[in-house]
């Protein structure tokens, strides 16, 4: 079988907000890559076996003492190097060029003039054949003097060195960000570096990844049994489908129905996995335990803790019944791995971790199976489709681990959860009907623990309030509220109030992030 990790790129992270985006773009080209902190062990960098190295952007300044720098082993490797933004600045500073602080930061669209087309730029244009490109800038410093052996390949009206190249050594640098979509020829530039200059084969495809992981899982677990906590979310669902294909009936999934899931989600999970795919799923109906444990609790963090601890407790009980299980499968994905690796100096970018299963009891002496640990979320979704999971499941909006427990403000009660699940289902149903679901990044309903006066028939009613929330975002770090049509919102409001007894008012949240968070709790 072809080794899909043979041709790979190493990205050294200098703390840029876009570093993961660089990796995702390279993976989209069909080439495997990894992100390591810039201060990673130099011997491991030298021994990684990359076909090329990318130096990412970053928030530091090369004009200050102690600025992060690429290890000498990078330059000694003889490999092609591509410096992006700060990555180009440290290339210049380390190789005998000069950088300086700009009078003011440059952030946004810019026009680059290609004056000496190199292997990356040759023939590219956004202006009808003229050697000009529309790019995205985000920098304070810039290269003022290119290092010896380098040619200035592009400039702008504001900076003398927008790109540079040493074609003999195959070292390149650009001041702009090819990884963002605002740089129209960005993916073409990355392809030229990764495929043309570095010579990488495009082996990183969904079908190849599935074959590779099936072989790895079979080698890892042998004839042992594996247990998986199935939540109905994308990651655990893809793990379930992948492991079922790899080891069949040796996989047992435990699905804990907390009573805090989306409308009829428990039945949908069982229909999909147990009935349609033949996966062995143990369904634990634990709603009574959850509502009893949450009684009288209104603090959001306390609710999260109770919900998380109870899941671990129930999962532990069920795993003890499976005497032959030697392995625990988890839906850990690549951003979790980057977070745990960290940086020795603390100057590299740290991403908040969202582990699927955390805090499992120490006495659970199970080995870990993590078939998604090399993948980004978009890759996990593509794998899910390739494995035959419905697109509607694979491309569902994010759902919080504690479920409706953090979308019911204040104390959680069974009747609140049922009302909210139905209201949420109506909202999502109408979004799909209006072809707006995929145009929003996340949409959901929130139960507000306040009553509002309304008129139902000829009588006054004093009933609950439902808030609707819909946002558009690229990375979930910042978000804009979705400008849904008024007529659409009116339709959703009418359905919720007419179909749900106990709701008299529906409001729409028009807060951005920041200052508000996407979830209410």
Curated annotation (Swiss-Prot):
The keyword Acetylation does not apply. GO terms for molecular function: ATP binding; GMP synthase activity. Its EC number is 6.3.5.2. One of its GO terms (cellular component) is cytosol. Residues 204-396 form the GMPS ATP-PPase domain. Keywords: ATP-binding, Glutamine amidotransferase, GMP biosynthesis, Ligase, Nucleotide-binding, Purine biosynthesis. ATP binds at residues 231-237. Pathway: Purine metabolism; GMP biosynthesis; GMP from XMP (L-Gln route): step 1/1. It holds the Pfam family NAD_synthase. CDD domains: GATase1_GMP_Synthase, GMP_synthase_C. SUPFAM superfamilies: Adenine nucleotide alpha hydrolases-like, Class I glutamine amidotransferase-like, GMP synthetase C-terminal dimerisation domain. Signal peptide: none annotated. InterPro entries: Class_I_gatase-like, GATASE, GMP_synth_C, GMP_synth_GATase, GMP_synthase, GMPS_ATP_PPase_dom, NAD/GMP_synthase, Rossmann-like_a/b/a_fold. Homodimer. NCBIfam families: guaA_Cterm, guaA_Nterm, PRK00074.1. Catalyzes the synthesis of GMP from XMP. This is GMP synthase [glutamine-hydrolyzing]. It comes from Stenotrophomonas maltophilia (strain K279a). The gene is guaA.
